[in-house]
Regions:
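Alpha-helical support elements that line or immediately flank enzyme active sites
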Residues: 60-78
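Short, conserved micro-motifs enriched in small and acidic residues
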Residues: 55-63, 98-105
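A short interface-forming secondary-structure element
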Residues: 42, 46, 51-60
């Protein structure tokens, strides 16, 4: 089933809202389970100052999104662009089944693509 980290972070994340004054937003969906996630980023001097999200997601996506958010606030966007699946595994302290890998990185992927949109670099990351 789910470890304690996933169970805790899947309940009522306080960063579930549409930020009013954001610099970039981005939407992604997981085509395996149809989770939908939209992130809102406030970026100043290439530092993530705030991150919020709205979603229609399962427990894994919600929990990984919230724990991911906690870890990237005040990080440089270039550093955030280097993070991938292994980073999520470190955060949740557990491997994720193949069936749930896309769910575990949906917030990360959506954030990376929001940053690419912010940078206007033409890059689109995929699962």
């Amino acid at each position: 089933m789910y470890n304690e980290t996933i169970t805790y972070y899947s309940k009522n994340p306080f960063n579930k809202f549409e930020m009013e004054k954001y610099d970039v937003e981005h939407f992604e969906e997981n085509d395996l389970c149809w989770d939908e996630l939209k992130v809102f980023l406030k970026i100043e001097d290439n530092i993530i100052k705030n991150w919020s999200f709205t979603w229609d997601t399962a427990i894994m996506t919600t929990a990984c999104g919230w724990v991911y958010w906690e870890s990237i606030i005040w990080k440089n966007i270039e550093e955030v662009l280097t993070l991938w699946y292994t980073y999520i595994v470190e955060l949740i302290e557990d491997e994720v089944s193949d069936r749930r890998k896309k769910a575990s990185v949906l917030a990360l992927l959506t954030t990376r693509n929001a940053i690419h949109k912010f940078l206007n670099d033409g890059i689109v990351d995929d699962f």
